[in-house]
Amino acid sequence: MEKFPMTPRGFEKLKEELRWRQQSERPRIIEAIAEARAHGDLSENAEYHAAKEAQSLNEGRINELEDLVARAEVIDVSKLTGDRIKFGATVTMIDEDTEEEKIYQIVGDQEADVKEGRISISSPIARALIGKGEGDTIEVNAPGGSRSYEIIALKFV
């Protein structure tokens, strides 16, 4: 079973979704199926078929979440140190073309959210950052073309 890195925050969000799907969503769907069954003929009962589809999707996601929770390697980022970028690092960098400052934390694939400044460890930017330090410059090939960034700060929080 292959482990994958995850922050405590990301792990808690996974467990929270799993609990919600098991304890709230599953009973709601079961009740919707029972209610739709009470309407009679199941062959032409759209409510029944919709509820069964919702059940299938929910159970699939529960199985996926259980697998992710079992394989997660939770890494407490606040205990990490060093002057090189690795999983969990929060990196401040400057786009050398636009002078725009960007701040990203490198996190696991399941918890990445660019809008919140969390990028996946397997993303092109993170792969370019790993192993680098303050003052280094990276080149990232993105869909919009190649971009250069200077790393100006690195911390583990």
Swiss-Prot record:
InterPro entries recorded:
GreA/GreB_C_sf, TF_GreA/GreB_CS, Tscrpt_elong_fac_GreA, Tscrpt_elong_fac_GreA/B, Tscrpt_elong_fac_GreA/B_C, Tscrpt_elong_fac_GreA/B_fam, Tscrpt_elong_fac_GreA/B_N, Tscrpt_elong_fac_GreA/B_N_sf
Signal peptide as annotated in the record: none
State whether keyword Lyase applies. no
Record Pfam families:
GreA_GreB, GreA_GreB_N
The yes or no answer to whether the keyword NADP is present is no
Query: What are the GO BP annotations of this UniProt entry?
Result: DNA-templated transcription elongation; regulation of DNA-templated transcription elongation
Q: Which UniProt keywords apply?
A: DNA-binding, Transcription, Transcription regulation
Recorded hits in SUPFAM superfamilies, A to Z, give: FKBP-like (SSF54534), GreA transcript cleavage protein, N-terminal domain (SSF46557)
Superkingdom: Bacteria
Q: Which GO terms describe its molecular function?
A: DNA binding; RNA polymerase binding
Q: Which family does it belong to?
A: Belongs to the GreA/GreB family.
Question: Which HAMAP family did the record assign?
Answer: GreA_GreB (MF_00105)
User: What PANTHER family would the database entry show?
Assistant: TRANSCRIPTION ELONGATION FACTOR GREA (PTHR30437:SF4)
What is this protein for, i.e. what is its function? Answer: Necessary for efficient RNA polymerase transcription elongation past template-encoded arresting sites. The arresting sites in DNA have the property of trapping a certain fraction of elongating RNA polymerases that pass through, resulting in locked ternary complexes. Cleavage of the nascent transcript by cleavage factors such as GreA or GreB allows the resumption of elongation from the new 3'terminus. GreA releases sequences of 2 to 3 nucleotides.
What is the protein's name according to its record?
Transcription elongation factor GreA
The coding gene here is greA
